[in-house]
Design a protein with these regions (language model features):
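Conserved, structured core segments of small domains
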Residues: 1-141
Length: 141
């Protein structure tokens, strides 16, 4: 099972305040633990929403909104993508994580859909296309 672990943004992360050297060392050690355990697939920190944009869809219309975005608690400041055997294991990995922000912070855990989750609508042709695209994307990495 794959899970996305999303570090929620804070006022500090949205202000562009970078982590301390100590925090970078702690996160580096945690990431090394994840990699050595064979569970980490990806992980990155994100720039503040002031450097981002959103595209709103309404039928065929597209509206672009530049950041920053107001609801800091709903924003993501970073993420990991991990592969583990259960949600409980994902929770245990998150509990071992150093606090990613000074003060209070939150990491949201969400399971990633797998091919079998889509049922009969996910035809053999669509599966083949997905596998081909994943292989091409891996080559691009």
């Amino acid at each position: 099972m794959r899970f996305m672990l999303m570090v929620k943004a804070t006022d500090d992360s949205e202000a562009g305040i970078m982590p301390s050297e100590e925090m970078l060392r702690e996160m580096g050690a945690y990431n090394e633990e994840l990699v050595k355990a064979g569970v980490m697939l990806a992980g990155e920190g994100l720039h503040p929403s002031s450097k981002g944009a959103r595209v709103r869809f309404s039928g065929k219309e597209r509206t672009v909104m530049d950041g920053p975005f107001a609801e800091t608690k709903e924003l993501v400041a970073g993420f990991w993508l991990i592969q583990v055997s259960s949600k409980e294991e994902a929770v245990e990995w998150v509990k071992r994580c150093p606090n990613p922000m000074p003060g209070e912070s939150e990491i949201e855990i969400r399971q990633v859909f797998e091919a079998d989750d889509f049922g009969d609508e996910y035809t053999p042709e669509l599966r083949e296309q997905e596998e081909r695209l994943r292989a091409q994307a891996a080559d691009n990495a």
